[in-house]
Curated annotation (Swiss-Prot):
Belongs to the universal ribosomal protein uS14 family. GO terms for molecular function: rRNA binding; structural constituent of ribosome. The keyword Ribosomal protein applies. Binds 16S rRNA, required for the assembly of 30S particles. Part of the 30S ribosomal subunit. GO terms for biological process: translation. Keywords: Plastid, Ribonucleoprotein, Ribosomal protein, RNA-binding, rRNA-binding. Coiled coil: none annotated. This is Small ribosomal subunit protein uS14c. It is found in: Plastid. PANTHER family: 30S RIBOSOMAL PROTEIN S14, SMALL RIBOSOMAL SUBUNIT PROTEIN US14M. The lineage of its organism: Eukaryota, Viridiplantae, Chlorophyta, core chlorophytes, Trebouxiophyceae.
Length: 101
């Protein structure tokens, strides 16, 4: 299980990403606009750089919601492969059962 501090840190990053998502998207769309002059582009880039570093979606890490594990996480379910297996074997995931042929 991951340290509680890592889980809390990732949670705070997620809040920051959601908070600045629209602003970042607006600035990036303005940046990709082809009719902007170089001065305007530099101003937009400066505004983008002033946003918090942790508000970038690329800084997020997929973590298991139950254990905090960072590797082997199924993004659809947001749980690690170990937890997924245990839940499936105990019958706690509806529609999921062990394969047999």
């Amino acid at each position: 299980m991951a340290k509680k501090s890592l889980i809390v840190r990732e949670y705070k990053k997620n809040i920051l990403v959601n908070k600045y998502y629209k602003k970042r998207l607006l600035l990036k769309s303005q940046l990709n606009n082809t009719i902007n002059s170089t001065d305007c582009i530099l101003k937009i880039l400066n505004k983008l750089q002033k946003l918090p570093k942790k508000s970038s979606p690329t800084k997020l890490r997929n973590r298991c919601t139950l254990t905090g594990r960072a590797r082997g996480v199924y993004s659809e379910y947001k749980i690690s492969r170990f937890v997924f297996r245990n839940l499936a074997l105990n019958g706690l995931l509806p529609g999921v059962f062990k394969a047999s042929w």
